[in-house]
Swiss-Prot record:
Modifications the protein undergoes after translation, according to the UniProt entry: Phosphorylated in embryos until cycle 13.
Lineage: superkingdom: Eukaryota
Annotated positions of the Phosphothreonine modification: 164
Predominant cellular place of this UniProt entry's protein: nucleus
A GO cellular component entry from the record: nucleus
InterPro entries: DNA_pol_a/d/e_bsu, DNA_pol_alpha_B_N_sf, DNA_pol_alpha_bsu, DPOA2_OB, Pol_alpha_B_N
Protein name as annotated: DNA polymerase alpha subunit B
Pfam families membership: DNA_pol_E_B, DPOA2_OB, Pol_alpha_B_N
Sorted UniProt keywords: DNA replication, Nucleus, Phosphoprotein
Subunit structure: Component of the alpha DNA polymerase complex (also known as the alpha DNA polymerase-primase complex) consisting of four subunits: the catalytic subunit PolA1, the regulatory subunit PolA2, and the primase complex subunits Prim1 and Prim2 respectively. PolA1 associates with the DNA primase complex before association with PolA2.
Residue numbers carrying Phosphoserine: 155, 166, 168
Length: 609
C-alpha cells in the first residue's frame, strides 16, 4: 500500500516522508480505503480546501482523519442499510466536484465531495458544517474567492517559483506613486462613494447602432483586397484633415503636390505629399528604413506610389508604421524624398463638456491579476479588499484575466470559460451591487476570441451592475465619456516609432491616437501574435471624438497625462514584479459660474497595491 501511495503522491508532485507514507497507509487500511488513488485525491482536495495546498505531515493527517475519514465512517454507520459505504458519489459535471476541481467552493461543501447523497438522520452526532464566511477578503490565506481547478497541487506550484515578485517590490502597499488634480480636490476627497447611485452605462462605439459582440462578429474573412481598401479609407479620412489643419483650403491650392505635379521636382515653395508611413521590413522604424506610400485617385495605378524618406534635413519628426502624414520637402533624384517638415496633427473634436451633477468615484485596474508563477490571484484579492472598503461608483477592469501564455494555464482541469465565470462570480460577490463593474477582456485571454477588436466573452450568469465590454470601448457614464482599451498600444507605438526632437514620449504616443483617429493606428501590428482585423477596426476601433478620460494600460511605467484636455491614465499592472498598482480618480460636478476644466474637476492617483 505504501508503494502505491508513494506513486500517486509522486504523480501529484508531492514527496512525503516515509513516516508520513506509513501513517497514510495505516489510515487507508483503518478506514477501508483500498484504492491509493482515491486516498490521495481525497487528501489533495482536503489540503487545498483547508491547508492552502500543504504537503501531508503527521500533524495535518490528524485533521484529515477527523474532518474527512472519521466523518465518512460516521455517515456510513447511519445509513439505513447499515452497510459500509463503498462509493462516495460520482464526480459531478458541476464545479463542486472534488475530482474535477481541487478548489474552495462557495460553502466549502466537504461532505458533498466525500459522502454519498443518501439521507442522514438529522439527530446524529457529527461534526457540523462550517458556516459560510461573510468577509471573504478579510483573510486571504483563509478564504479564497475562487480557486482554479488543477491537475497539479498548489503546493507544487508555489515551490516552482524560485522568487516571488514581492521580493523586489519598491515601496509599500498604499503608497501614492503618481498624482494629478487641484490640491484642494485631492485633499478633500475620502476616495469613497458618498451615496448609492446607479450609474447608467451606454456604449458609444457602434456600427449600425450596435456594439461589437460575439453575435454580430464576422472575422477570419479579412481579405487582402479588403485590407487595402480599409487602409485607403483611413488615408482618405486623415489626409485631408492634416492638410486642412496645416495649410487650409486656400494654402493647399497654392502648393505643389506629389504625385500630381511630379514633373516639377524643384520648386521654391517645396513639394508637398500626403502618404502613409511603412517600414521596409515591417519592423521598428529608423532613419533609413522608412518609406511613404502616396495615393491619388487621379494617378494611373501602374505608377509606383512609394517614396523612400531621407530625414537628414528634418528638425523634428515622430512617425510610425501605418501613420498618415503630410510631408514637405523635395525629390533630388529617383524616388528619394528629402524631408524638411513632417506634419501629423489635425483639428480634433473636443470631448463633451462634463455634465455630471454629483461626484463620481472610479477605480481602474489592469491585468494580469496573478503572479507569473501561480494562479492564486493574491494581487486581485488585495484589490478586492480595497474595493470593499472604499466602494467606488465605477470599477473598470481590463485584461488579461487568464493570460493564454501563463505557465500554469496548462494545469487547469476545467475549461477557460468556467474558470473565468468563477473569477467574475467571486469579484461580483465581493463588490456587491453598489458599484458598476466594467470588464474589458483582452485578446491575450485564454477564453477570449483571438481577434482585434475583441468582443466580450458571453457569461452564463448575468449581474445587473456588470457590463462586459469589447476592446476597445467608448462609454458614456451619466454625462461623462470614458475610453478604454486592454491592448498595450502605447508600448507598441514607442517600440516601433522613429522620433527626432519630438518631445515627451508618452505625450506624443497619446497624440498619435488622437490625430490618427484610432485606438490602434499601427499597421501592420507591432505584436506578431495580434490577430488584427482591418474590417472590424474600421467599424469598432475609431476614435473620432476625444473622451473625457482615456484608459491606456501598458507595460510602460504608470502615468497620468493631460493631453488636449483629455486625462489619459496608465494604471500599471495589478500583478507586477516591481509592485502592482491601480488608479483611482474622481470627477466633481462643475461649480456654477466657473469654467469647467479637467484640472479643477478631476483628481487622480496611482496607488501601490
Amino acid at each position: 500500500m505504501e508503494e502505491e501511495l508513494k506513486q500517486q503522491f509522486d504523480e501529484m508532485g508531492v514527496e512525503p516522508a516515509d513516516a508520513v507514507l506509513g501513517r497514510c497507509a495505516e489510515l487507508a487500511i483503518t478506514y477501508n480505503i483500498h484504492d491509493a488513488t482515491e486516498f490521495v485525491e481525497q487528501w489533495m482536495a482536503f489540503s487545498l480546501s483547508h491547508l492552502q495546498g500543504e504537503d501531508p505531515a503527521i500533524e495535518n493527517l490528524g485533521d484529515f482523519e477527523r474532518k474527512v475519514l472519521q466523518l465518512r465512517k460516521d455517515k456510513a454507520g447511519y445509513k439505513a442499510t447499515g452497510q459500509k459505504a463503498k462509493s462516495y458519489g460520482s464526480p459531478s459535471v458541476q464545479d463542486t466536484s472534488s475530482l474535477a476541481t481541487y478548489g474552495v467552493m462557495e460553502d466549502d461543501p466537504m461532505l458533498d465531495d466525500y459522502v454519498s447523497e443518501s439521507a442522514v438522520d438529522s439527530s446524529a452526532l457529527h461534526t457540523p458544517k462550517a458556516k459560510k464566511q461573510s468577509d471573504r477578503t478579510a483573510n486571504l490565506k483563509g478564504a479564497a474567492l475562487f480557486s482554479p481547478a488543477s491537475y497539479t497541487p498548489q503546493s507544487a506550484k508555489r515551490k516552482a517559483g524560485l522568487e516571488t515578485p514581492s521580493n523586489s517590490v519598491a515601496g509599500k502597499p498604499g503608497d501614492i506613486v503618481d498624482t494629478f488634480g487641484h490640491p484642494k480636490l485631492l485633499a478633500g476627497s475620502s476616495w469613497q462613494s458618498q451615496m448609492e447611485h446607479t450609474v447608467p452605462v451606454t456604449q458609444k462605439l457602434l456600427h449600425n447602432d450596435a456594439p461589437l459582440t460575439i453575435a454580430n462578429l464576422g472575422y477570419m474573412n479579412d481579405l487582402l483586397t479588403d485590407r487595402c481598401h480599409n487602409l485607403r479609407v483611413r488615408f482618405n479620412q486623415t489626409g485631408p484633415a492634416l492638410v486642412d489643419k496645416k495649410l487650409g483650403q486656400a494654402g493647399a491650392a497654392e502648393c505643389i503636390w506629389y504625385p500630381q505635379d511630379r514633373q516639377v521636382l524643384q520648386s521654391a515653395g517645396g513639394l508637398h505629399a500626403v502618404g502613409m508611413i511603412h517600414s521596409e521590413d515591417d519592423g521598428p522604424l529608423d532613419a533609413h528604413s522608412a518609406f511613404m506610400a502616396v495615393l491619388d485617385d487621379d494617378v494611373e495605378d501602374e505608377m509606383d506610389p512609394t517614396l523612400t524618406l531621407n530625414f537628414s534635413r528634418v528638425k523634428s519628426a515622430s512617425i510610425f508604421p501605418g501613420q498618415v502624414v503630410l510631408a514637405k520637402g523635395f525629390i533630388p533624384r529617383g524616388k528619394t524624398f528629402m524631408v524638411e517638415e513632417i506634419h501629423t496633427e489635425r483639428k480634433l473634436t473636443p470631448a463633451t463638456p462634463l455634465q455630471i451633477d454629483r461626484e463620481l468615484q472610479f477605480v481602474v485596474a489592469s491585468g494580469p491579476f496573478t503572479d507569473s508563477t501561480d494562479l492564486f490571484y493574491e494581487p486581485l484579492h488585495d484589490l478586492l479588499k480595497y474595493l470593499k472598503d472604499h466602494r467606488p461608483d465605477v470599477l473598470v477592469l481590463t485584461g488579461p484575466f487568464l493570460d493564454a501564455d501563463h505557465k500554469m494555464v496548462g494545469e487547469l482541469a476545467e475549461t477557460f470559460d468556467t474558470f473565468f465565470e468563477k473569477m467574475i462570480g467571486g469579484i461580483m460577490e465581493s463588490i456587491g451591487s453598489h458599484t458598476a463593474v466594467l470588464v474589458v477582456t483582452s485578446q491575450k485571454d485564454a477564453m477570449a476570441l483571438s481577434v482585434y477588436p475583441t468582443p466580450p466573452p458571453a457569461l452564463r450568469r448575468t449581474y445587473p451592475n456588470l457590463y462586459m465590454l469589447p476592446d476597445p470601448s467608448l462609454v458614456d457614464l451619466d454625462g461623462f465619456t470614458l475610453g478604454v482599451t486592454s491592448t498595450d498600444v502605447v508600448d507598441h507605438l514607442l517600440s516601433h516609432e522613429f522620433a527626432v526632437n519630438a518631445g515627451e514620449r508618452m505625450h506624443r504616443a497619446i497624440n498619435h491616437l488622437f490625430h490618427q483617429g484610432s485606438f490602434y493606428p499601427l499597421y501592420p501590428p507591432a505584436d506578431e501574435d495580434m490577430a488584427y482585423d482591418s474590417q472590424l477596426a474600421l467599424k469598432y476601433a475609431q476614435l473620432k471624438q476625444l473622451p473625457n478620460v482615456l484608459i491606456l494600460p501598458s507595460d510602460q511605467r504608470h502615468f497620468i497625462r493631460l493631453v488636449n484636455d483629455c486625462l489619459v491614465i496608465n494604471p500599471g499592472r495589478v500583478a507586477d514584479k516591481k509592485g502592482g498598482t491601480f488608479a483611482r480618480f474622481l470627477v466633481a460636478p462643475s461649480v456654477p459660474g466657473k469654467a469647467a476644466n479637467m484640472f479643477n474637476s478631476v483628481a487622480c492617483q496611482v496607488q501601490r497595491i
